[in-house]
Amino acid sequence: MQKIYNHQNVEDGIESKWREKKYFIDHNLDKKPFSILLPPPNVTGKLHLGHALDSYIPDTIIRFKKLSGYDVLWLPGMDHAGIATQSKVESELYKQNKLTRHDLGKEKFLAEVWKWKEIHEKLFRQQWQTLGLALDYSNEAFTLSKEVNEKVIKIFVELYNRGYIYKKNRAVSWDINLQTAISNIEVINKETPQKMYYIKYFFENSSEYLTIATTRVETMLSDVAVIANPKDKRYKNLKIKFLIHPITKKRLPLIFDEYVKIKFGSGLMKLSAHAEADIEIIEKLGLEVIETIDKNGYINAPDYQWHKMERFEAREKMAQFLEENNYLIKAEDSISNVSYSDRSNSVIETLMLPQWFIKMDHFRDLILKNLSSKEKIKFLPNRYKNNLKRWMNNVYDWNISRQLWWGHQIPAWYKDGKMKVQAESPGQGWVQDSDVLDTWFSSGIAAFSFFKWENDDAFFKRYYPSSLMVSGYDLIFFWISRMIFLSLEFTNQRPFKEVFMHGLIRDKDGRKMSKSLNNGIDPIEVVEKYGSDALRWFLITNTAPGMDIRYNQEKIESAWKISNKLYNVALYISSMPDNNLEAKSSKLSEQSKWILNKLSALNKQIQKVFKTYDFSIIGVEIYQFIFTDLSSWYIELIKSLNIKNEAMYVFKKILIMLHPFLPFTSDYLFNKLYNEELLEQSWPKFKRFKDSSEINLLIDAITKIRKYRDDNNISKKEKLYLCLKEKISKKNLNILLSLTNSEYKENKDFLIVLDNNSIFIEISQEQKQKQKQELEKKIAFCQSEITRAQNILSNQSFIAKAPKEKIKLEEDKLQRYKQELQIYLEELKWKY
């Protein structure tokens, strides 16, 4: 071992050793299984801090379970990430070659995407290995592999045959940038500054008008009606029932519907084809849906001057037209919720398109039934179970079709106006649906398809349902819910027994990390600077179920110091003189029994934490054990003792227990000190030793003597002369004198009270006089306070008027000062 800790030297080569020895690939079927599925990262880029957290939590759990005697399986996989990957590749193609996917054609473009996938798949594996993850690479899966594709197609066809999948022209959220429909939960609403336009809609054959407020002037060309709330007194008694459109001059019926908010704008709403709620009302009333904005976000109205104009430009030009023709009353600045694509951050357009949907009523019931059954999934923290229930009770049908090339192509076939849904082509002339499935469809079946469902029954039965799912709380609806209902439908089992929802990682100011804020942190750069153990320690010990984490550089530096401290302890123990004895629990020193009791108590806490996964609780306790119990006390207390065998025995247990939290450091030190492999060991067992009162007394005495030096500005080099009221063993007395730079000398000068003993420290005549004066001041103060309290309590007027609490306070003060006075008088008597 080098004399100075260097995390790069320590961590180098260890992960490759774990893989070579197949610690997490070879499975002992005689042991109880424990399985976890790694949330598959998208093959779109590289690892970010969220991935690191998603990885370190299950890795820590897997290592604990392995050492505790389980056959562990941590199954890795990657997600083809349809929209995200295709848009990345398209962007790169255009940046490098000025080519679009249409220039290449589907076959060549998909070949480029597969190349991208291969490159980033390798990059992810390298990064997993840098983090030191205990993954079973021999069972790695991919959501667009041949095996998974076969299962996706089978499940789609089966769901269709069961009546749970349908195709229909419906209002969908269309991403203009990505050129695909997206599901409702991929839409985010943002408060956005925009103009609210107040427009005149004149009554038919009248100079009177109604005022309609809208932020979306560009949708006016698709207006088919004006609606008001039937409870709105301003409009319910109107006799004229038609209005003339200010631009198209069409007759628009005035219709009443409770959807309209009376207090929003003028209380009137124009019905157009570019809002989901509007379309629902239009269809309910049997009116025509007239779309005037196309898939590219351009106006599609050949009869009007704004035809082929970009939608937001058209908004301004149409508002200008209305103003010039005296139809615009005013335009006010306003803040309103606007729907954006969570994928591309572009403003969503609502379009009527033929799309594939999953009916959610049946699957809602499946989830709700499971959550109240004996085989229910346990949520940690439990509040996310309630969140899921609320969401499922308000769930929309799931739009599962995407207008992409990269993904699982929908197994629907068309010919002569007919449609068939099946895995293989029905024959010549049949054309397959060009849409692909939403990425979350294949991710949703990963919970069982990755565990070799219908491919390897023995493997599936052993490891499914998985023991635990670890995920960020932001995926509960996107992914967790879909895994649950698809697993219940096709395996008749829950996908996992427990699900642990962790928080998100934010920057030091609590902001979400994003490219736009330029506040992202590359975990690999952190690992290079501080080591994987330091980053792991920071992320793990700041993880409380469901709570966000703020990135903190200082805490990572502090985490590095933990490994550094352990390294230095190992250096010291290895340098101790050999005594060639075997450590036996029956013959251990008091010091070793004391530290083992401390370790036993820590073990109980660690065992509890691995049931709740609230790792934020254990971090402080482990830190205190390493820096205080182990380094500050145990190592100090054994320096004068020839017990290397015991120190090695103790430290071996410590390293095994710390392995889940500091795998690289613990593995390296274990191998160097014991020439054995840590991952071939078992979790230590403990017997409780009788508490060593002398060791506790020793620590108490040393602590208080050091404080005495600090309080009196006495140099550590200056020798103290002291004695103890009660005798302790010669061995422990020598340790006390050595660690406090003292000599034993009978005296009764300065008293330090311990729990079960007392120390007297000799002081000079000058110090004695000064201390006597201080003591006399304390006596005088107590006497003064006693007199004051007695006078107040003997005052009948005070007793009659004062609140009981105030009287009680004075009585307590009187009692306390009497007790203190007695102590000070006794001290004055026997000291001076």
UniProtKB/Swiss-Prot annotation:
SUPFAM superfamilies: Anticodon-binding domain of a subclass of class I aminoacyl-tRNA synthetases (SSF47323), Nucleotidylyl transferase (SSF52374), tRNA-binding arm (SSF46589), ValRS/IleRS/LeuRS editing domain (SSF50677). Belongs to the class-I aminoacyl-tRNA synthetase family. ValS type 1 subfamily. It holds the Pfam family tRNA-synt_1. It comes from Mycoplasmopsis synoviae (strain 53). Monomer. Its EC number is 6.1.1.9. One of its GO terms (molecular function) is valine-tRNA ligase activity. A motif ('KMSKS' region) lies at residues 512-516. It is found in: Cytoplasm. Keywords: Aminoacyl-tRNA synthetase, ATP-binding, Coiled coil, Cytoplasm, Ligase, Nucleotide-binding, Protein biosynthesis. A motif ('HIGH' region) lies at residues 41-51. InterPro entries: aa-tRNA-synth_I_CS, aa-tRNA-synth_Ia, Anticodon_Ia_Val, M/V/L/I-tRNA-synth_anticd-bd, Rossmann-like_a/b/a_fold, tRNA-bd_arm, tRNAsynth_Ia_anticodon-bd, Val-tRNA_synth_C_sf. PROSITE patterns: AA_TRNA_LIGASE_I. This is Valine--tRNA ligase. Residues 760-831 form a coiled coil. It is an enzyme of class 6 (ligase). ATP binds at residue 515. One of its GO terms (cellular component) is cytosol. CDD domains: Anticodon_Ia_Val, ValRS_core. Catalyzes the attachment of valine to tRNA(Val). As ValRS can inadvertently accommodate and process structurally similar amino acids such as threonine, to avoid such errors, it has a 'posttransfer' editing activity that hydrolyzes mischarged Thr-tRNA(Val) in a tRNA-dependent manner. ValRS has two distinct active sites: one for aminoacylation and one for editing. The misactivated threonine is translocated from the active site to the editing site. The C-terminal coiled-coil domain is crucial for aminoacylation activity. It catalyses: tRNA(Val) + L-valine + ATP = L-valyl-tRNA(Val) + AMP + diphosphate. PANTHER family: VALINE--TRNA LIGASE, CHLOROPLASTIC_MITOCHONDRIAL 2 (PTHR11946:SF93), VALYL-TRNA SYNTHETASES (PTHR11946). GO terms for biological process: valyl-tRNA aminoacylation.
